[in-house]
Each structure stands twice: as C-alpha cells, then as structure tokens.
C-alpha cells in the first residue's frame, strides 16, 4: 500500500482521531476502529491532496460525519466481500433467479 503524505502526521493528530472515535461511540457506533477511520480519511477526504498542514488534518478529522464514514465502510465491505463467490451466495443467487 502506498503511503499517503498525511501518514507523516498520524501520531500528531492521534488525539483528534481518538476524540472522533469517542464521538462515534456516544452515537452508538462502538465498533469503528482507528485504522478504518484513518483509511477513510486518506482514501476519501485527502485522496487528491499532496500537501496538508496539521490544522487542516485536525479540522477534517473533527468534521467527519458518521453517515459519510458508514457509507465509505459499507462500500469498502462490498468491495472486499466474496459472498457471491461462496456456496451460500451461489445458492441465494440461484434462488433469486428462479
């Protein structure tokens, strides 16, 4: 996996990441992990940015909405899921096509 320019500052913004994870827990999303939040930020929020300052990173982290993150997480889970390739998935597909 290619390193993102923001990875240099990950340790500096870690308190902001933990703060956002705590906010998600208060909203009932206990299973969000730091790495998945970081992946969302580097893959979506900062995808095309090559130069970032720490205050921009902190602001972007604190402005993440749970809906935006969950949309990203859902799409990523579909991308990595091989359910249709499984026997159970094939049976369900055949049942739908009858």
Swiss-Prot record:
InterPro entries: Post-transcriptional_regulator (IPR025716). GO terms for biological process: establishment of competence for transformation. Its main location: cytoplasm. GO terms for cellular component: cytoplasm. Disruption phenotype: Disruption results in severely reduced transformation frequency, but has no detectable effect on either the frequency or the location of division septa. Keywords: Competence, Cytoplasm. It comes from the Bacteria. It is found in: Cytoplasm. Interacts directly with DivIVA. Required for post-transcription initiation control of the comE operon. Promotes the accumulation of its target comE mRNA to septal and polar sites. This is Post-transcriptional regulator ComN. It comes from Bacillus subtilis (strain 168).
């Amino acid at each position: 996996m290619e390193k993102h320019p923001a990875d240099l500052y990950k340790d500096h913004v870690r308190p902001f990441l933990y703060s956002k994870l705590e906010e998600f827990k208060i909203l009932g999303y206990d299973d969000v992990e730091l790495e998945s939040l970081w992946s969302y930020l580097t893959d979506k929020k900062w995808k095309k940015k090559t130069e970032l300052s720490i205050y921009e990173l902190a602001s972007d982290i604190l402005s993440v909405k749970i809906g935006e993150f969950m949309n990203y997480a859902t799409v990523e889970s579909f991308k990595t899921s091989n359910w249709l390739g499984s026997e159970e998935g094939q049976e369900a597909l055949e049942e739908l096509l009858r």
